């Protein structure tokens, strides 16, 4: 699944940044065109597209969303690459507060991977340690 030795976490972060940058550039170009030409419908559509791309990128870079995305993929596939990506997402973002739904998704992913055939014990231990050190429940 991995290419060029990149971790899935690094690829996920790069993709989020690409969305932010392309959205920001599209939005800036559409605003500049709107200001210089006095506006038109196509430029308004481009502004919306740029804004949406920027928001998607920003939301993907939010630590709680990263953890939930990797947890969802891990529980669906039981792939050790997604387990390593989940570990990276928890460790590289410091202490992350998760909602009840995200916590249950994360617990499901860890338990499903730990119970699967051929689960690497070292990865399971690292998942549990990262969970204990870097995840806490939100206040509400």
Regions found by a protein language model. Give the residues of each.
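Short, aromatic- and cysteine-enriched interfacial helices/patches
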Residues: 42, 55-58, 138-140
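Transmembrane-cytosolic junction motif
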Residues: 14-15, 55-74
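Hydrophobic, membrane-inserted alpha-helices
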Residues: 25-33, 51-52
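Hydrophobic alpha-helical transmembrane segments
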Residues: 29-52, 58
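Charged, low-complexity cytosol-facing tails and large interhelical loops of integral membrane proteins
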Residues: 74-140
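Select subsegments of transmembrane alpha-helices in polytopic membrane proteins
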Residues: 15-23
């Amino acid at each position: 699944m991995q290419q060029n030795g990149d971790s899935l976490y690094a690829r996920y972060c790069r993709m989020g940044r690409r969305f932010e940058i392309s959205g920001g550039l599209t939005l800036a170009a559409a605003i500049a065109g709107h200001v210089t030409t006095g506006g038109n419908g196509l430029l308004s559509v481009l502004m919306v597209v740029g804004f949406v791309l920027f928001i998607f990128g920003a939301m993907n870079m939010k630590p709680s969303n990263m953890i939930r995305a990797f947890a969802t993929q891990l529980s669906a596939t039981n792939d050790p690459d997604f387990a390593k990506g989940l570990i990276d997402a928890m460790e590289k973002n410091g202490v992350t507060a998760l909602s009840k739904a995200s916590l249950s998704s994360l617990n499901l992913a860890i338990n499903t991977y730990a119970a699967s055939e051929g689960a690497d014990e070292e990865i399971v231990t690292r998942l549990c340690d990262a969970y204990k050190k870097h995840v806490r429940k939100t206040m509400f």
